[in-house]
């Protein structure tokens, strides 16, 4: 079901944990877990020694690429459950395992019958996703069957939980039945997910003008706008994505909405800044980020004239993640400051 309503959270609610305990007869860990930034810190400090990735390209997606690589290399074991190779498979712990799995476009015959999963979009719509393509290999397993297999193997070491892992993967309706009983909003899950177009999860303000606030009304908050003032010679760098990109997957080098093509190591800069520094378009430069007295330098970038406010520059994600210091995070969310990085730029002769 994914990481939105489905419960993938390093700080799950007591209500959700209680529901899991009632459904499966186990006692889930209630200790608060670690977000992405904290996980990298824990691996670097040796507090976490096993890293398991359910898809994705953690190394490339994470801030401070070199620090993240160092943390992964400190692990005793790194495991990647993946549909295709990526950079994270090449930077590993002492022992590394790659478990290839079926992609959502591939036909899933786990349990001897056609299976499907559901996905949830950012609008809160849940719908079924059925693969039809021939799998790349007859030996590929689905993600649910891989996870169940890992669980069964662990239980042979640490003791049985009472969960029938084989039944969960023999028919994915069984998994969805458990989701229905543990996550609010998934009533009649197996029936509704088969409806063309799927179904909407509850949204109290939309559904009935109900606001879960202390006043029972919609609360509006105003904040004063703040500008980040940088020292002379510095810029504020933001990372962006191109048109032909989905997360860390790059499908081509044609960012057609911006009129940029042929490469990705570009520094988009205002014309006035280029002229004021005596630079020129397509000039090769290095970028250095600055945070709390520390610096990170990355070379091999090219200046592109672009309609962006003076003293601001833009670079593509994930190539410029290397410049975002691990400790440079947003207040509250603890997410990397990918839209606000202080940098200086120097020409390379």
Question: Could you describe each region identified by the protein language model?
Answer:
Residues 1-179, 233-236, 240-349:
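Non-catalytic alpha/beta scaffold blocks inside enzyme catalytic domains
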Residues 182-186:
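Short, flexible helical or helix-coil boundary motifs
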Residues 188-200:
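Segments of small-molecule ligand-sensing domains
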Residues 199-207:
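Short acidic, Pro/Gly- and aromatic-enriched capping/linker segments at domain boundaries
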Residues 211-212, 218-219:
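Segments forming glycine/polar-rich beta-alpha architectures that bind adenosine-containing cofactors
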